[in-house]
Swiss-Prot record:
<dbReference type="GO" id="GO:0051301">
    <property type="term" value="P:cell division"/>
</dbReference>
<dbReference type="InterPro" id="IPR005758">
    <property type="entry name" value="UDP-N-AcMur_Ala_ligase_MurC"/>
</dbReference>
<comment type="similarity">
    <text>Belongs to the MurCDEF family.</text>
</comment>
<keyword id="KW-0131">Cell cycle</keyword>
<protein>
    <recommendedName>
        <fullName>UDP-N-acetylmuramate--L-alanine ligase</fullName>
        <ecNumber>6.3.2.8</ecNumber>
    </recommendedName>
</protein>
<feature type="binding site">
    <location>
        <begin position="122"/>
        <end position="128"/>
    </location>
    <ligand>
        <name>ATP</name>
    </ligand>
</feature>
<dbReference type="GO" id="GO:0071555">
    <property type="term" value="P:cell wall organization"/>
</dbReference>
<comment type="function">
    <text>Cell wall formation.</text>
</comment>
<comment type="pathway">
    <text>Cell wall biogenesis; peptidoglycan biosynthesis.</text>
</comment>
<dbReference type="GO" id="GO:0009252">
    <property type="term" value="P:peptidoglycan biosynthetic process"/>
</dbReference>
<keyword id="KW-0961">Cell wall biogenesis/degradation</keyword>
<dbReference type="GO" id="GO:0008763">
    <property type="term" value="F:UDP-N-acetylmuramate-L-alanine ligase activity"/>
</dbReference>
<dbReference type="InterPro" id="IPR000713">
    <property type="entry name" value="Mur_ligase_N"/>
</dbReference>
<dbReference type="Pfam" id="PF02875">
    <property type="entry name" value="Mur_ligase_C"/>
</dbReference>
<keyword id="KW-0963">Cytoplasm</keyword>
<dbReference type="GO" id="GO:0005737">
    <property type="term" value="C:cytoplasm"/>
</dbReference>
<keyword id="KW-0132">Cell division</keyword>
Length: 494
């Protein structure tokens, strides 16, 4: 495609931290639209490899000379967020040369210009709800452009430049950057306390959602889950401002646009009965909504996606058909594999949950999977994410993890943060009352988990850090154990 489709300052872009979920998506869209892209990252990753295969020039490590990877040099340097150290040599060199340094949200806003924008935000469920919306619109033949914080199972990518006139994106609320956007349709899944390291107070965090809603374009709509107290309160405030609000949830009422009437787990999927407001559907009465992903929270996410899709003209029944084919998002209760142990199998899942509410929802889904299986236990390997979050939610993490039968707590994955005195995985472990092991030695965890597993168990690796690497290691250790106990028996099955 011609670079004429891109603003002049985005035709030759260098991206610092290009392999991350958000940055790699922007890079893909720039490449799809004919731009030249270079970048750097601290380490090799799936995202880095995929972008190289599409023509991006990427260097591991940070060096000022990386700005010259592209012929003619970069016209802009993009960073993930303001937390990138100002001493980063590439940013220092960009400023010395007078090359504009811009943040990812500003670039995404430019890429969405001129399109009907549908944006999903909230404390939990953003990535899954955004992905459901994308898959549903694709099924309806709309071919949306999209940028999402996870990898869609169906597409194997986190971003795409589509031929349609709509753009679907996940709006990150963690640092206020969602205020860069002016959506036509905004979906808010829920609002709970989080990211207090940036906002300083719950009140400030909640206020950013109000400000975001006020940026909805005239004639647009807010889609919000009112099962959540924070969402219900926001819906009321938005209504008072004259914003069109479409509420969804499980509590029926005259103001509800979509209601979850009933829901039943079926294997690793679910069947729900829903009711839509008369103005949203040609045929009245309960409808069946089938999903291939487990958990009541997934059914609510699907309702939000359904309402958003209908707002831009997608027929409700076609959207429901599309949602039935949604296969999930990488690292959202993703089945890593299965291993035969004794007379039953052990299933290993991986999940991105890093907030107490997310943990509770994921463990509820795991319980439902167990009820459909061989009656094993629920084992969790939890890695706290960020020292500030661990300090704020240590007790809540412990209480949420108590829904498991056995818990392995790792040390904190600090990411961008420096350690805080007195804060570690032990801060969480002391609040866990079910059988628990605190294992600060990351290299020792897989063997311990595999040794503790029993036939029929479900194991969930959980957190936003590198705990995701443990799933395959646990499966390998389980296979070795199975082969030792029954020579010649098949090991990992999936």
């Amino acid at each position: 495609m011609s670079t004429e489709q891109l603003p002049p300052d985005l035709r030759r872009v260098h991206m610092v931290g290009i392999g991350g979920a958000g940055m790699s998506g922007i890079a893909r869209i720039l490449l799809d639209r004919g731009g030249l892209v270079s970048g750097s990252d601290a380490k090799e990753s799936r995202g880095v490899h995929a972008l190289r295969a599409r023509g991006a020039l990427i260097r591991i490590g940070h060096d000022a000379s990386s700005l010259d990877l592209l012929p003619g040099g970069a016209t802009a340097v993009v960073t993930t967020h303001a937390a990138i150290p100002k001493t980063n040599p590439e940013l220092v060199e960009a400023r010395r040369r007078g090359i504009p340094v811009v943040l990812r949200p500003a670039v995404l806003a430019k890429l969405m210009a001129g399109r009907t924008t549908l944006m999903v935000t909230g404390t939990h469920g953003k990535t899954t709800t955004t992905s459901m919306l994308i898959v549903a619109l694709q099924h309806c033949g709309l071919d949306p452009s999209f940028a999402v914080g996870g990898e869609l199972g169906e597409a194997g990518t986190n971003a795409h430049h589509g031929s349609g006139d709509c753009f679907v994106a996940e709006a990150d609320e963690s640092d206020g950057s969602l205020l860069q956007y002016t959506p036509h349709v905004a979906v808010i899944t829920n609002i709970e306390s989080d990211h207090l390291d940036f906002y300083g107070s719950v009140e400030a965090y909640v206020a950013v959602f109000d400000s975001f809603v006020e940026r909805i374009v005239p004639g647009g709509a807010l889609v919000v889950c009112t099962d959540d107290p924070g969402g219900a309160a926001l819906a009321q405030r938005a209504t008072e401002l004259g914003i069109r609000v479409l509420r969804y949830g499980s509590v029926p009422g005259e103001t509800m646009a979509a209601t979850l009437v009933s829901w039943q787990q079926q294997g690793v999927g679910a069947v729900a009965h829903i009711r839509l407001a008369s103005e949203l559907a040609t045929a009245q009465g309960p409808r069946v909504m089938r999903l291939s992903v487990p958990g009541r929270h997934m059914a609510l996410n699907a309702l939000g996606a359904l309402l958003a899709a209908v707002q831009i003209g997608a027929p409700a029944d076609e959207v429901l058909d599309g949602l039935a084919g949604f296969e999930g998002v990488r690292r959202r209760f993703e089945l890593v594999g299965t291993c035969g142990v004794g007379k039953a199998s052990v299933r290993v899942f991986d999940d991105y949950a890093h907030h107490p509410t997310e943990i509770s929802a994921t463990l509820a889904a795991a319980r439902m999977v167990l009820e459909q299986g061989d009656g094993g236990r629920c084992m969790v390997v939890f890695q706290p994410h960020l020292y500030s979050r661990t300090k704020a939610f240590a007790a809540e993490f412990g209480r949420a993890l108590n829904a498991a039968d056995e818990v392995f707590v790792l040390d904190v994955y600090g990411a961008r943060e420096q350690p805080l005195a007195g804060v570690s995985g032990a801060s969480v472990a002391e609040h866990v009352t079910v059988p628990m092991r605190y294992v600060p030695d990351f290299s020792a965890v897989a063997q311990q988990v595999a040794a503790a597993a029993s036939p029929g168990d479900v194991i969930v690796t959980m957190g936003a850090g590198d705990v995701t690497l443990l799933g395959p290691e646990i499966l390998t250790a389980l296979r070795v154990r199975a082969n030792r106990s029954a020579p010649g028996r098949p090991g990992v099955l999936g």
